[in-house]
Amino acid sequence: MIFSALSAANTVVLASGEADYTPSLVSFAWIMAAALLAPLVSYMLKNKMPAVALLIIFGMIIGPSMLDLAHEDPGIGMLKELGVGALFLLAGFEIDLATLKSKQAATGFSTWLICMVSCLVGAYFLLNDIPGAIVMAIALTSTALGTITPMLKQDKLIGTKVGDSVMIHGAIGEVAPITAMALLLGTRSTLGTMLILLAFIVIAVGVAVMPRALIVAVPWLKTAFLSGAGSTNQTILRLIILILAILMAVTSVFELDIVLGAFAAGIILNRIIPDEFHKGLENRLDVVCYSMLIPVFFVVSGMSIDWQVIVNNPFKVLGIPALILVTRGLPVFLRENIHHTGSDIETTRERLQVALYAATGLPIIVAVMTIAVGSGIVDEETSSIFVAGGALTVAIFPLLSSLVKGKEENAQSKAKAAESKQEGREGAEQKGAEKK
């Protein structure tokens, strides 16, 4: 009875409101239940399964293909888009532009280019279809920077050599595929797309300089913003959300992926916010974004996975993570081992960690498959297989990276313990010799 009343398909008015919103509200309730349950289950599993992976799994469970408790209607779809924006806003906020001008960034881009060209050639020979080959190459060579950023925070890797390297590979693995999608899969000509991208860059720069220009022109604005920053007005956070909204709207109007606008907003904030305010602002953004918007994105992404497709094509679904690991993770691992990339990573285990995180992909896979299905390049079943495979990379690769890190730490602890034990023995022998 209760489950029937809470079914997303039920259109009975549950409270004094419009009946049209009832399915959205019911779906939202189930989505937030999944969002709350995920970190609790992750804690029960001693954090061996990332909460992000559980959000996707629980989304699939409550979605149309399994329990059919929640659906992605326009209202939920809007929340999902805002979740994507919040996710990449925070990812961009973590990026230091100076690192993108480094040797490591140049090596990261050349590595991605090698991955992309190799996949493109291989897919073309297999499919004998250029649009299909482009779709496969983009899907197999992306990195889910926004998705792995919370995992890096959970594993306390932000600010470390491994974390910095992952952030660089992730930034390139997000922006480069998005640009490739716009140039190679767009309905406009290549020249038209390049002009659109140039126009977006000009607008983004304008948005970046506008706050400071306004403060110079109207000096009292700074005092007004600071006085309302910690009150119910929350002027600073509202300014940030306005910048995010403007750039997401611009990319949507220009028919670009909104990830590009959100990521640009994060980078802009990193530049215009003074360093001494970064930590406090980041904590407040975490509260705003991770309490609702970002979990909604992951749960709704899980809801879009067709369980029946996984059951009918288990080997194909399992093959996608393996293929991504070979086409994206392996080149990153090999470049880190045989070439001085500037990352200063010393151990093989750390390089393996970077490779596993770099091979984690989902948002770009979802985006490129959505475009491909809409254009008739791939069918719904192929899209579901790739999305399910992308979700598996989110569930598996960060977990493997954590295990690799754990083994490394255990090995270091054992080595230190053995060293201390040996020093103790030597000290005892020395004392015994002195007594004699």
Where are the predicted features?
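Short, strongly hydrophobic alpha-helical membrane anchors
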Residues: 1-22
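Structural signature of hydrophobic alpha-helical transmembrane segments
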Residues: 17-32, 72-88, 130-145, 196-207, ...
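Structural signal for the N-terminal portions of transmembrane helices
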Residues: 24-32, 73, 77-83, 106, ...
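C-terminal ends of transmembrane helices
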Residues: 33-47, 88-102, 146-159, 210-225, ...
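Membrane-interface junctions of multi-pass transporters
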Residues: 45-47, 61-103, 220-320
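Small-residue-rich segments of transmembrane alpha-helices in multi-pass membrane proteins
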Residues: 53-65, 109-121, 168-182, 226-247, ...
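Transmembrane alpha-helices that form the ion-translocation and gating core
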Residues: 101-158, 299-304, 312-380, 385-408
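Membrane-interface helix-loop-helix junctions at boundaries between adjacent transmembrane segments
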Residues: 126-138, 148-195
